[in-house]
């Protein structure tokens, strides 16, 4: 909680990321309400080394096909970032990412994605991948929804 308490809400910033290995679970359509269940299923599947990591970062990728239709609450996969040297399914590509933190419930994703996309355009950049929701502080950390911290990331070019 403390690490993200000072994160400024709603401000778009850019950060260079190295390739980040992860394990994932992919479905045809993942609705927002199914994310927690699928993350638990994924965690169970990889429990041997996800427990070793401890405070691993988990997230979901917004489905680009649905996003192109203006639907923001459909996801293509859920994932746990792992660490180099541990088993993984894929890696988020290295590169520059536009980022934005927001607090509270997950029901305002469309609004936050709009702010992120506007910040990308204002910087003269273009999206180069789907929006990623990274759950920095969630129900596993606090039972107070107003303390949830989500980071949106989108690779840019």
Per-region residue spans from a language model:
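A solvent-exposed interaction/effector surface
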Residues: 1-157
């Amino acid at each position: 909680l403390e690490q993200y308490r000072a994160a400024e809400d709603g401000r778009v910033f850019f950060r260079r990321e190295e390739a980040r290995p992860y394990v994932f679970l992919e479905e045809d359509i993942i609705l927002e309400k199914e994310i927690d269940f699928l993350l638990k299923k994924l965690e169970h599947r990889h429990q041997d080394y996800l427990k070793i990591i401890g405070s691993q970062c988990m997230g979901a990728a917004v489905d680009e096909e649905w996003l192109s239709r203006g639907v923001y609450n459909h996801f293509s996969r859920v994932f746990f970032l792992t660490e180099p040297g541990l088993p993984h399914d894929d890696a988020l590509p290295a590169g520059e990412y536009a980022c934005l933190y927001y607090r509270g419930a997950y029901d305002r994703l469309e609004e936050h994605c709009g702010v992120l996309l506007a910040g990308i355009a204002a910087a003269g950049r273009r999206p180069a991948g789907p929006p990623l929701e990274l759950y920095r502080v969630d129900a596993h950390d606090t039972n107070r929804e107003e303390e949830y911290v989500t980071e949106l990331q989108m690779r840019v070019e």
